[in-house]
Amino acid sequence: MILHAIVPDAATAGWAAGNGASVVQLRLKDVPTAVRVRVGREVIASVGDLAMIVMNDDVAAAEALGVTVHLGQGDPGVERATRAGIRFGRSAGTPEEARRAEAEGALYIGAGAVWATPSKTDTGPAIGLDGLRAICRAVSIPVVAIGGVDASNAADCVAAGARGVAVIRAITELPRLRALLEIAVADSGDGRER
């Protein structure tokens, strides 16, 4: 099960990792790479071995830090990440985008936005649970649901086939989300680590 917390700083990253996040993604918009590297070092120190660390959008920062990078559909860098041996995740809003990301070598898919959300306004229309289900069926790599996900609907995402959820606004619900997702995975009955 993947509980993916998208954070703005090291303090939030450390709290998230200590409260059940298995992945911590540093998302700093409109700042230079040098700032991302500096804050990324703080995140690494704060998180330690508690969670996988992901840098949002910046391949150069990910390379400098030795962490995974997450790339949206419009973000450049897949070729550079591949050449440098950097693991990467990809955003996808359709099964076709997900299949393309898997073919590129993506480690995971961030699928959504599942529901409309004010946290990320540069996405297409919400894909809903049917769209999430279609993406999950289209690929063999893990799919993480993002966009409007919180404690009230995270289990529905797992039931649709997601291996986990990503949260921004619902980060304060991490302990409850972890418990709910563990129940949802147990109820799925397939025995796979999600």
Regions found by a protein language model. Give the residues of each.
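A short acidic, helix-capping loop that chelates divalent metal ions and anchors anionic groups
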Residues: L26, A62, W115-T121
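Active-site-adjacent loop and "lid" segments of alpha/beta metabolic enzymes
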Residues: T121-A126, A145
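Conserved N-terminal beta1-alpha1 strand-loop-helix module at the mouth
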Residues: M1-D75, R80-Y108, D130, A134, ...
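Conserved catalytic/dimer-interface elements of ABC ATPase nucleotide-binding domains
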Residues: A166
